[in-house]
A protein has these predicted regions:
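Domain-level signature for soluble enzymes in the chorismate/prephenate branch of the shikimate pathway
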Residues: 1-277
Length: 277
């Protein structure tokens, strides 16, 4: 049985992702309060696999998680893209007329801004987790409170779904990374199926340095699907570039990494894995 560390409670979007990614397999979920705790679990027990959100089509990149990934020593072995759908739920004995507050993660509240604007009588309260909000209300039987979470979480905690699909934008997707101890990577993904990689590198303050790297990647038929820059702490005005690459030929991709290595100050391959639509 695989042990999967996630940020959040049972019923959270990380939990849904874990069950979808490992569909048909027996898994044990380890609920963590923070993303730091996810990586700490992998460090303590090399058999643990982690699920980590990295970007959302509306909220953007989770910048802190890029740094956690780089510093953790783990490797990326997969990705999963989840359609985020928000519902509002409450205790079975409550209804619209009895509700006073709605609790959820700040990002979920932001993504349901129009719905909340249409219900000015509901006080929006920030919480640490979407599913955790539903769990708290259910376990403490708090009358007058509602939670914004997935309908999956609502049903898990015996809550009543008042309305589904309350998010502003239907094109709301989160991309999650599956990470593990590097020595366990071969057991979780066949390298011959890899057609995507995540790398990070820094560059010297030379004119055209980034352009030269991109030109070489293009020569090897490597496609950039994302590039994210973050300050390199301790090195003024120097940046780390987190890049996602896709390719058709694993050998050509690895040749491209060899070719750009002399042009960068530091380079690290964060993972090689199969791209998901």
């Amino acid at each position: 049985m695989k042990r999967i560390a996630i940020q959040g409670e049972r019923g959270s979007f990380h939990d849904i992702t874990a069950h979808q990614y490992f569909e048909g397999e027996q898994i044990e979920i380890i609920c963590c309060a923070t993303f730091e705790e996810v990586f700490e679990n992998i460090k303590r027990d090399p058999t643990v696999v982690g699920i980590c959100a990295i970007e959302n089509t509306i909220a953007g990149s989770l910048l802190h998680n890029y740094e956690l990934l780089r510093q953790s020593g783990t490797t990326v072995v997969g990705e999963h893209k989840l359609h985020i759908e928000h519902s509002i739920c409450c205790l079975p004995e409550d209804d619209w007329s009895t509700l006073q507050e709605v609790h959820s993660h700040p990002v979920a509240l932001m993504q349901c801004g129009k719905f909340l604007a249409n219900h000015p009588d509901l006080k929006a309260v920030e919480a640490e987790d979407t599913a955790g909000s539903a769990a708290y209300i259910a376990q403490h039987k708090v009358r007058g409170w509602a939670a914004i979470c997935s309908s999956y979480a609502a049903h898990m905690y015996g809550m009543k779904v008042l309305q589904e699909n309350i998010h502003d934008n239907p094109h709301n997707y989160t991309r999650f990374l599956v990470v593990c101890n590097p020595q366990k990577a071969a057991l979780l993904r066949p390298i011959e199926k890899a057609n995507k990689a995540s790398i990070v590198f820094s560059l010297a303050h030379d004119k055209g340095s980034l352009s030269k790297v991109l030109t070489i990647l293009s020569f090897y038929d490597i496609n950039l699907t994302k590039i994210q820059s973050l300050p390199n702490i301790g090195h003024e005005w120097e940046y780390l570039f987190y890049v996602d690459l896709t390719f058709d030929n694993l050998t050509r991709y690895r040749q491209s990494i060899d070719a750009i290595t002399p042009l960068v100050k530091k380079i690290k391959v964060l993972g090689e894995y199969e791209e998901k639509e």
